[in-house]
């Protein structure tokens, strides 16, 4: 939760004036990590120049560099890190030529990013949230008590600024490191699948499940404490509403609320994105398995055909007889299977003959509605006709009835623009949508 008091031009001029620059090739970065690791094992946090040279020798051996110029190269590396403000050098008149070195905040920050922050710990996060909850509660109680400006600075603003905000920044940094770890896991999975996906399936599953579990642990821990943290922040905000001179506290509380909302929101969004990637990987694996299964079968079949004379084989297949439904009520549906297919001309002639007979009968029966000027409810009429015919003929009969009915007249309700209700016309789910014909 850093707050810059300088403008961008001022910061640029300041960096240019002090000649700030960082250049860390992989060997120099490895040397810095080695120094930080060895420094962490010492109680005083100090290292002599000889110890730095020993650390550089280990790095040089790991990179298979020549050992003849180890002293010169180590001295150059140490001087370069001092120039880049990664190491501080302290000399004394009593021990001339035997300097003492300490890591600078910049050096600690870089090495901390690569070493200590690489490990996610639910316990560490829980402890951080516990400390934040305690600090916020004390700040909220102090805000509720009220007091002078010194009281607000000492008991409310300072804990929020220098404890709560820094822990929020640490949690935010943990999330950003998890983002990088997700990208690294994706790269590892891609490399595994490109090499030998069959052997890589178990490794991919392990990477996916571990990352999903870590993200879920992080989010569950945040959500469990998020409501309490927000409640205490709201208590502080309510206490500042009656004081016009506490804008600095109110602004800080607003920034903390935004930071907390952003942390929790991104945690859930990160989980959703990872779930989508997880499904994508599993879909790819399933597709690869299906494709490879067919490819293996085709390859084995080709190999069997090529080596038939050396290793003869026999192919056995089965073909079940077709079951024919001979019930009388289903004869119309299975007519082609029982009697065989009719020639096109004969089939067309049979259909036209039936259609003409039905059309003549239906036309004669429907003419009564026109003669008597009786409204014709197409849904009821079609249902009555279909009840007289088997299900296989329902479509043809319904089409004939509708064609003959629309020739008699129109429905005045059609001109209103309102849709007609759907009416069932048989017991098999068929429906018709039509207004009552009342104008012939």
UniProtKB/Swiss-Prot annotation:
Protein purpose: Involved in chromosome condensation, segregation and cell cycle progression. May participate in facilitating chromosome segregation by condensation DNA from both sides of a centrally located replisome during cell division. Not required for mini-F plasmid partitioning. Probably acts via its interaction with MukB and MukE. Overexpression results in anucleate cells. It has a calcium binding activity.
Region of interest (Leucine-zipper), residue spans: 208-236
Domain of life: Bacteria
One function term, GO molecular function aspect: calcium ion binding
InterPro entries in the record: Chromosome_partition_MukF (IPR005582), MukF_C (IPR033441), MukF_C_sf (IPR038198), MukF_M (IPR033440), MukF_M_sp (IPR036141), MukF_WHTH (IPR033439), WH-like_DNA-bd_sf (IPR036388), WH_DNA-bd_sf (IPR036390)
A Gene Ontology cellular-component term: nucleoid
Localization per record: Cytoplasm, Nucleoid
GO biological process, alphabetically ordered: cell division; chromosome condensation; chromosome segregation; DNA replication
SUPFAM superfamilies registered for this protein in UniProt: MukF C-terminal domain-like, Winged helix' DNA-binding domain
Source organism per UniProt: Salmonella paratyphi B (strain ATCC BAA-1250 / SPB7)
This protein's encoding gene: mukF
Family: Belongs to the MukF family.
Subunit structure, as described in the record: Interacts, and probably forms a ternary complex, with MukE and MukB via its C-terminal region. The complex formation is stimulated by calcium or magnesium. It is required for an interaction between MukE and MukB.
Keywords: Calcium, Cell cycle, Cell division, Chromosome partition, Cytoplasm, DNA condensation
Protein name as it appears in the record: Chromosome partition protein MukF
Broad class of where this protein is predominantly found: cytoplasm
